[in-house]
Amino acid sequence: IFMVDMKKKGISKTLIEVAFPVPETQWQLFFDNVELTEADVLGEVGKGFNILFDTLNPERIILSGLCTGVGRFALKKAVAYANDRKVFNNTPIGAYQGVQHPLAIARCEIEMASLMALKAAWAFDQGLPAGEFSNIAKYAGAEAGIHAVDAAIQTHGGNGFTKEYGIYDLYGLVRLLR
C-alpha cells in the first residue's frame, strides 16, 4: 500500500455524481506514470492486503452505526405517522397489527445490528482481531437499515415517496451501504 501525495505529477481525479444524497463525495482517481519512492510505502512491503483490510474495520463499524441510525430515524418517523394517521372510525393505523409487525421486526433487526457493532468496536478497541465482527456488523447494519426504511415507506403508503415526509431519500443511502 502506498500513501501518495495527491499533488504529485500524474494524479488526477474526477467527481462522480451520485443519484441521491450521500454524506460524502465520491471520486474516480487516475494514476498515470506516478513516480513513487520508498517513503511512499505505508506499512510493510508484501503485507498491503492485510493492512488494507485491517483499515477497513473501523469504517465498517461506523457504517453499521450509520445504517442503524438511519433505520432508527426512519422507524421514529413511521411510528409517529402510524399514531397520527387515522382511518376507519378515527382509529390510528398504528393500532393494526399489519402496520405494527413490520415496524417491530425492523426494530429488532436494528437492535441486533447495533449490538454487533458494539461487539466489533469493543474488539477493535481492545486490539483484538475485529475483521469478522466488523464484517458481520456492517452486513447486519445495512440489512437492518434497509428493512427499517422499507417498513417506514410502507407505513407511510404513498406519502413515503414524497419529499414532505423525507423517508424515500433514506433508501438510497442505506442501499448504497449494503
Language-model regions, residue ranges each:
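FAD-binding core of flavoproteins
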Residues: 1-76, 80
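Alpha-helical interface subdomain recognition
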Residues: 28-33, 54-178
